Amino acid sequence: MCIRDRINAGGVLHNLGYWSCGTREYFGVKPVNTVEDFKNVKIRVQDSDIVRSVWSALGANPTTLAYNELYSGLQNHVIDAAENDLGNILLQKFYEAGPYVSLTDHDIATRMFLIGANKYNSLTDEQKQWVDEAAEYACKEQRAFDKDLNDKALETIKENGGIVNEVDKDSLIAACADAKDAAAEKIGVTDLYN
């Protein structure tokens, strides 16, 4: 059963599709190319046991720091790195304090496009078809817009001095396998990964 089916089977919400919020990338005072490069890197992360376990699996030292202290934390070497989507790296000018942007794509951020199940189920079949078609179109257009936005953000970061590199993602995936499995078990979604 996929996430969409699980939500729709719950009877409270009806999932019409998914929107993209970009992918999260590493940025910091040094680049990372392979899992070995993460060793002892103090990286600012969200306050989450699961998030910390993933970065620890890479050998990094996950550190909690308020978002509004992130820029100065990089400048003052309180942290070595952080992670966010390209749009926020650009808007907050994090590439100035942490000029190395390594394209880890470690978190693919999505948002669900939802409607109340009662409302959806009250529609006629024809109305449901209209809603479904409109939602499919909206999701497709939004994902294309988001991709374009992220592509432009990446180019602007480069134009303003950000140093961008690709990463050996296979080494990261392998290093995080146990953390991913533990997280899936903890939140009860192991079947979605299998």
List the model feature ranges, each with a label.
Residues 1-3:
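Short, small-residue-biased leader/transition segments that mark boundaries at the very start
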Residues 5-194:
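N-terminal secretory/targeting leader peptides
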